UniProtKB/Swiss-Prot annotation:
CDD domains, per database record: YitT_C_like_1
The family this protein is said to belong to: Belongs to the UPF0316 family.
Record flagged with keyword Cell membrane: yes
Keywords: Cell membrane, Membrane, Transmembrane, Transmembrane helix
Protein name: UPF0316 protein RBAM_006820
InterPro entries membership: DUF2179 (IPR019264), DUF5698 (IPR044035), UPF0316 (IPR022930)
Sequence intervals crossing the membrane: 9-29, 41-61, 67-87
GO cellular component, one term: plasma membrane
NCBIfam families: PRK04164.1-5
Keyword field contains ATP-binding: no
Subcellular location: Cell membrane
Amino acid sequence: MMQTILSNSIGMVLIILIINIIYVSFFTIRMILTLKGQRYFAAGISTIEILVYVTGLSLVLGNLNQIQNVIAYALGYGLGVIVGMKIEEKLALGYITVNVITKELDLDLPKQLREKGYGVTSWVAGGLEGDRTAMQILTPRKYELQLYDTIKTLDEKAFMIAFEPKTIHGGFWVKAVKKRRIKE
C-alpha cells in the first residue's frame, strides 16, 4: 500500500508535506525546550525529529526531478513552524514576570491579586504625576492572558511590561508558584 502511495505524485506530495510539518514542529518545540533549559526532554524530542527528517529528506532527494516534491517540502517547513509555535503556545511552558505600575496609588490592588492566587511583590513608586503602586508578579505562562485581563479589570490604565525570566532562585516564588492555582 505504501508503495502505491509513493508512486502516486499527489500521494507523494502529501506525505512529504505532512512529514515536514511534523519534523519542523518537533524542531520548533525542541528549540524552545532547549532555550527554557529542558535539555533532556529536548534531547528526546531531537531523536524523533531526526528520524522524521531523514525520512522526509530521502523522499525529496530520491525524487528531485519532480518540482512538486520540493515545493511540498518547502511548504511543509513553513507550516511546521506555525504548527510548532501553536503547540508551544498550548503547552505554555515556563513562567512570566509582569511588572505593573498603576495609574494612581492603589494599595488594595496587590491584595486583590494575591486573593486570586498570584504571587505579588509591591511597593510605592514615585511617578511624574505622584505616587503609584508598582508590582512584580510571577506566574506560570498558562495564566498569562488571565493575569492581563484581571489587571485590566482592576485598573484599566495600568502600565504593564512582561518578560520571561531565565532563572528563578529562592524566595516565596520557588515553592509556592509551582503549587499555586489561579482563581477565575
